[in-house]
Structures are given as C-alpha cells and as structure tokens.
Amino acid sequence: MIIAIDGPAASGKGTLGKRIAGHLGLAHLDTGLLYRAVGAACLAAGKLDDEAASVEAARTLDVTTLDPESLRTGAIGEAASVVAARPGVRAALVDLQRRFAARPEGAVLDGRDIGSVICPDATVKLFVTASPEVRAERRFKELAARDPLASYEAVLADIHKRDERDSNRAAAPLVMASDAVLLDTSHLGIEESFAAALAIVERARG
C-alpha cells in the first residue's frame, strides 16, 4: 500500500504522513527534507545560485544522515524552494523516492508531487491544504520556538512566495492529482485532521 500526501508549504502534510505511517506500521518519507538537505548543502557551500552544484548535492544525498530539526529553518526552507524548481535536482531525487515507495509492505510519502509524478499509481492520494494565513500561523509557531526574531508577517510573505514558485515552476509544479481526495485542514486541529485522513485511507483499503 502506497499512500501519497501532497500539499503546499506548512499545510500539515508531514505531520499527517508521520501519524498515518505510525498507525499503519509503514515507513514514512518526508520528501521535503530531501530538498531542504540539498538547499542546506548549497547554502553551506555558498552555491545556492549554482544549478550544477545543487544537482550534484541531490545526486550524492545520503537519506540516512538527514536531521529534520536542523533542516527546519526559514532560510533552509527558502533555499529548498529555490533548488526544487530545478529540473535536474528533481530528476536526481525522483529515483530515490520511487525506490523508497517500492518497499514490499508499502510506504507513506509526503511532498509536492507524490501523487502526480512520483507515485501516480498510489493506493491512496491525499491533497492536504489550508489557507495561507493558517499555514503561516502554524509555521510561525514552529519557528518562534527556535528563533525569537521570527515574525508572522515575514512567514506569511514567505508562504505566498513559495506557493507562487511551487505552483508555477516548470518541473513538476504543485497540482492536485485528478484522483486525489482534498483535505482542507484550515479549521481542523491535529487530531481532527488525522481522523479525517485516516478515514479516507481506510475507505480506500476497503
């Protein structure tokens, strides 16, 4: 069973993916971390504008060394959005994601193009979204715990910018797969969102 969860930045898809995977005993891959890791590598090398360097970083990425906490900063999130728009980076990471999904028992993957590009034959496809304001508030609370200088206005502006870039990039733009189920979490808490998502998964399992 492959469960594909897509959606824009800070929509809650990663939290849902982790919860669903844990509940069903499946492996989970937050594919956004892959792009964050590539973005972080480029930032560290001072080569965010170097497309060849970003493609090489994607090709040599070791998923076993990913550190979610260190990768969840505003600067790395912005860098991830930049490198994710590059076809060469996406191509380098597609095979890695598909190998992960090909586990005999199945897997849960969340990202921007799982249901539309990576796993078009997924058993279940969810498209998780929320209003930009709600997503900005969620991301702001995450960042404020680590960065006292974080501001809601800056986070909201970043959300709008990332939405624009994700939706209009040439390589695998953010789109809802035609056979995906829409889940709007604007007015749902974590537990309510999980219950709604799990109900969709259970229906698909029959």
UniProtKB/Swiss-Prot annotation:
Sequence positions that bind ATP: G7, P8, A9, A10, S11, G12, K13, G14, T15
Lineage: superkingdom: Bacteria
Enzyme Commission code: 2.7.4.25
Entry annotated with the keyword Mitochondrion: no
Reaction catalysis annotation: CMP + ATP = CDP + ADP; dCMP + ATP = dCDP + ADP
Localization: Cytoplasm
Keywords from the UniProt entry: ATP-binding, Cytoplasm, Kinase, Nucleotide-binding, Transferase
MF-aspect GO terms: ATP binding; CMP kinase activity; dCMP kinase activity
GO biological-process terms attached to the record: pyrimidine nucleotide metabolic process
GO cellular component entries: cytoplasm
Cell inner membrane among keywords: no
Protein family per UniProt: Belongs to the cytidylate kinase family. Type 1 subfamily.
Protein name listed in UniProt: Cytidylate kinase
Source species of the chain: Azorhizobium caulinodans (strain ATCC 43989 / DSM 5975 / JCM 20966 / LMG 6465 / NBRC 14845 / NCIMB 13405 / ORS 571)
